[in-house]
C-alpha cells in the first residue's frame, strides 16, 4: 500500500487530535469513493476512522456485532483500495496538489524578483493557484 502525504491542516480535520497519514489516507479514500460503498460499510468506516469510535461503540450504535463492524470496515477498505488501484483518482489528486504547490512557490519567487506589471501578474496567478488548492 502506498501512503500519500496529504498536505492539510490536520487540526482542522480532527478538532486538534493528532492523526496519522494512514488515517488521513482512509479519510481521503472515503471522500473519493464512499458513495460507492453500501450504507452500512460507509457508516462503519466513517465512525471508525473519522469519528474514532471503537468497534464496540460502532456495534452498539449500528445494532450489529463487533465482528460485523470489523467485516464491514475491511470490506469497505478493500473495495476502496481496489477502486483506487483501477482509477488512480486519489493518486492523481495528490500529484496535482504537489504540482500546484510547486508552481505557487515558483510564482512567489518570481514575484519577489520582478516589479511592475509582471509582479502584479505573478501575485494574481498565486491567488488563483491558492484558490484551486483550497478547493481541493
Sequence positions of predicted segments:
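C-terminal flanking helix
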Residues: 77-84
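Intrinsically disordered, low-complexity basic tails/linkers immediately adjacent to helix-turn-helix/homeobox/MYB/SANT
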Residues: 86-113
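Helix-turn-helix DNA-binding elements, focusing on the entry/boundary residues of the two helices
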Residues: 55
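Residues within the DNA-recognition helix of helix-turn-helix
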Residues: 72-75
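Helix-turn-helix DNA-binding motif, specifically the short coil turn and the N-cap/start of the second
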Residues: 65-66
Amino acid at each position: 500500500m502506498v501512503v500519500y502525504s496529504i498536505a492539510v491542516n490536520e487540526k482542522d480535520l480532527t478538532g486538534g487530535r493528532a492523526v496519522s497519514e494512514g488515517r488521513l489516507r482512509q479519510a481521503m479514500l472515503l471522500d473519493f469513493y464512499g458513495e460507492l460503498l453500501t450504507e452500512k460499510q460507509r457508516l462503519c468506516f466513517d465512525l471508525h476512522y473519522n469519528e474514532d469510535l471503537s468497534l464496540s461503540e460502532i456495534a452498539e450504535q449500528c445494532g450489529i456485532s463487533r465482528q460485523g463492524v470489523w467485516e464491514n470496515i475491511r470490506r469497505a477498505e478493500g473495495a476502496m483500495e481496489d477502486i483506487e488501484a483501477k482509477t488512480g483518482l486519489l493518486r492523481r489528486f495528490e500529484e496535482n496538489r504537489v504540482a500546484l504547490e510547486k508552481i505557487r512557490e515558483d510564482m512567489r519567487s518570481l514575484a519577489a524578483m520582478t516589479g511592475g506589471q509582471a509582479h502584479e501578474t505573478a501575485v494574481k496567478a498565486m491567488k488563483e493557484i491558492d484558490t484551486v488548492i483550497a478547493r481541493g
